[in-house]
């Protein structure tokens, strides 16, 4: 079929949420003429649920996005109202930053960034179809009949795909926050041959700040110590007048109200069909599943400086409006609270992610990429990370350059994508530190060391950032080398000082680096014995030095595991392999291999239901028969 196109682009991104924004900024910054199409310009980078960025594992993803040259970290650093480092009492592998956002300012600032970006056209329009010829994308069709040509298309439609809002007995077609749903595109993705799933998520009610009795709640302030998501942000710009959050709890009266109205709850009446998020359940789900708990935490989170709206984190619900009011008024501090918005559930279509490659390109259609909640994930950060990778690979494909695949040992983004394309997901996927087997090397403090060079190579890290990174890396490397070269000897003068500090004396000579491996010896103590570095070191470099030195043994073990897995990842599986021709392989493994069609032995070994014996048989088969090459 011959199409008459009215406009032509290298890449078209459908949807301007957190995934779409990162995808379109990446493609345009890499030199591709890009169209970012959205149903509503006023919803660009909007936060339809929680007014926050970061958190456990998620905060590390934002740092990774920033290190690669993405925008989320820079934008939240300009628009936060509170910043807090989580898990400070635990090891460095699980520490993560979380910011309360001024949600309207966050969206407005991101819109300004997109509007000013060269090579990027922003358009309010609804895309109804993906145009495909001979198994590859050629463009899109709008609801008004316009055809735009494209060499690659990135679908980042969030919860808009056949979205339906559910509130008590009320159910109607809608995207998030009462935006338009994308129904025709959902139908046409299915017609293209993609396997579609149905998920559900929800949001809590918002209450009016001036109607809250804060005296009955517990204050939750931000941190005084400066922290940032972007490696380019300065401590001098750290916000002093942060806005606190507040903690309260449900109680037995709250639980009674919910239990008495479960027959009206869409989650239990059969109205909701989609699968909901395990790690962000509705309050009615929590009351039923954890009936023995006397109370559940609720955090009152301001949605910005210039609004009275307060987000009641932990109270996600789709109960009828009258029940929500009674529920709110049963909670300490909210007895007279005015509900400004009701909570609701939203059901939406997803593209089942086992149909994707690790580049986030669909296996079925060349040049078609998907990212974000479209792939079955939950969370702004997960969406942004996928959007960035999908955008990068769309641009690389258009330019005929090698693809970018982040491994599980490279980034949490790599862990997430590998989980999605290798294991799929039966529920909205959320990143957790427990999902990362190499989490000690995927830390908050070293994201730039892991990923900035990759961002530079693909063209997303500019000269200013690259220069700052080189200075930091050189200072780190030089000081690490210096600490490893200076010896402390167990002489009386040294041991007297060590004992005066309350520490065990030295019995053998050791380097300053070895001295720092002692749990009680921090960098400041070590340099008091060996003298300071040639130049003043930033606090973040000192933190990185302490972590790398104190956990060196564990880090080395992790890197050894990475090296072993790398050998598995380098063993490719032909695209045209006949799984039925492999004798002795278990039936479950054969079925999973057919469904996932893994690209490497490493990926095959991570598929659930596949055991080591299956992998051994597969490797023997490939050594004798695997001559073909995978092509896309």
Swiss-Prot record:
List the keywords (alphabetical).
Cytoplasm, FAD, Flavoprotein, NAD, tRNA processing
**GO MF assignments:** flavin adenine dinucleotide binding
Compartments reported by the entry? Cytoplasm
Entries under InterPro entries matching the protein: FAD/NAD-bd_sf, GIDA_C_N, MnmG, MnmG-rel, MnmG-rel_CS, MnmG_C, MnmG_C_subdom, MnmG_C_subdom_sf
Is Iron included in the keywords of this UniProt record? no
Q: Where does FAD bind?
A: 15-20, 127, 182, 373
Cofactor(s) needed, names only, are:
FAD
Annotated Gene Ontology cellular component terms? cytosol
Q: Name the SMART domains on file.
A: GIDA_assoc_3
- Whether tRNA processing counts among this entry's keywords is yes
Which sites bind NAD(+)? 276-290
On assembly, the entry states:
Homodimer. Heterotetramer of two MnmE and two MnmG subunits.
* Stated family: Belongs to the MnmG family.
Q: What does this protein do?
A: NAD-binding protein involved in the addition of a carboxymethylaminomethyl (cmnm) group at the wobble position (U34) of certain tRNAs, forming tRNA-cmnm(5)s(2)U34.
Q: What is this protein called?
A: tRNA uridine 5-carboxymethylaminomethyl modification enzyme MnmG
Please tell me the species this chain comes from.
Streptococcus pyogenes serotype M2 (strain MGAS10270)
């Amino acid at each position: 079929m011959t199409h008459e196109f009215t406009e032509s682009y290298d890449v078209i991104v459908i949807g301007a949420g957190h995934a779409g924004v990162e995808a379109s900024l990446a493609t345009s910054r890499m030199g591709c003429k890009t169209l970012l199409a959205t149903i509503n310009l006023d919803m660009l980078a909007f936060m339809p649920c929680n007014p926050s960025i970061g958190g456990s594992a998620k905060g590390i993803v934002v740092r990774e996005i920033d290190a690669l040259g993405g925008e989320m970290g820079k934008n939240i650093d300009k628009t936060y109202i509170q910043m807090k480092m989580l898990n400070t009492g635990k090891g460095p592998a699980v520490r993560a930053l979380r910011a309360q956002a001024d949600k309207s300012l966050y969206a407005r600032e991101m819109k300004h960034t997109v509007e000013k970006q060269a090579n990027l056209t922003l358009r309010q329009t609804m895309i109804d179809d993906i145009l495909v010829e001979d198994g590859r994308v050629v463009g899109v069709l709008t609801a008004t009949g316009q055809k735009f040509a494209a060499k690659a298309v990135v679908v980042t439609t969030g919860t808009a795909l056949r979205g339906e809002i559910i509130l008590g007995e009320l159910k109607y077609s809608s995207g998030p926050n009462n935006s338009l749903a994308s129904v025709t595109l959902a139908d046409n993705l299915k017609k293209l041959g993609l396997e579609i799933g149905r998920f559900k998520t929800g949001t809590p009610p918002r209450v009016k700040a001036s109607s809250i009795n804060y005296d009955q709640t517990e204050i939750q302030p931000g941190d005084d110590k400066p922290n940032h998501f972007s490696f380019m942000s300065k401590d001098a710009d750290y916000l002093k007048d942060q806005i606190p959050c507040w903690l309260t709890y449900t109680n037995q009266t709250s639980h009674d109200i919910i239990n008495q109205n479960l027959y009206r709850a869409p989650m239990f009446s059969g109205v909701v069909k989609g699968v909901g998020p395990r790690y962000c359940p509705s309050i009615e789900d929590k009351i039923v599943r954890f009936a023995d708990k006397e109370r559940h935490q609720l955090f009152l989170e301001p949605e910005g400086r210039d609004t009275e709206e307060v987000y009641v984190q932990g109270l996600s619900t789709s109960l009828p409006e009258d029940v929500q009011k009674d529920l709110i008024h049963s909670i300490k501090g909210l007895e007279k609270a005015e509900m400004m918005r009701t909570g609701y559930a939203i059901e939406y279509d997803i593209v089942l992610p086992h149909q994707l490659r690790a580049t986030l390109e669909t296996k079925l259609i060349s040049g078609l990429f998907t990212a974000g909640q479209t792939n079955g994930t939950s969370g702004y950060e997960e969406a942004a990370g996928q959007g960035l990778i999908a955008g990068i690979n769309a641009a690389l494909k258009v330019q005929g350059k090698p693809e970018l695949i982040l491994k599980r040992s490279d980034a949490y983004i790599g862990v997430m994508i590998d989980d999605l394309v290798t294991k799929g997901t039966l529920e909205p996927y959320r990143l957790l530190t427990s999902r990362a087997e190499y989490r000690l090397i995927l830390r908050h403090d070293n994201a730039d060391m892991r990923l900035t060079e990759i961002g530079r190579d693909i063209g997303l890290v500019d000269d200013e950032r690259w220069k700052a990174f080189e200075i930091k890396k050189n200072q780190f490397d030089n000081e690490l080398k210096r600490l490893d070269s200076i010896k402390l000897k167990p002489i009386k003068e040294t041991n007297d000082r060590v004992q005066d500090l309350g520490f065990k004396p030295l019995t053998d000579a050791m380097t300053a680096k070895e001295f720092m491996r002692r749990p009680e010896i921090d960098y400041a103590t070590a340099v008091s014995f060996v003298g300071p570095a040639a130049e003043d070191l930033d606090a973040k470099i000192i933190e990185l030095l302490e972590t790398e030195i104190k956990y060196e043994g564990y880090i080395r073990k992790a890197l050894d595991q990475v090296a072993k897995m790398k050998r598995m990842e380098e063993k490719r599986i032909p695209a045209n392999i006949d799984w039925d021709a492999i004798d002795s392989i278990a039936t479950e493994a054969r079925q999973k291999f057919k469904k996932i069609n893994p690209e490497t032995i490493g990926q095959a070994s991570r598929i659930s239901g596949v055991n080591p014996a299956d992998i051994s048989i597969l490797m023997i088969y490939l050594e004798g028969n695997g001559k073909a090459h995978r092509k896309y």
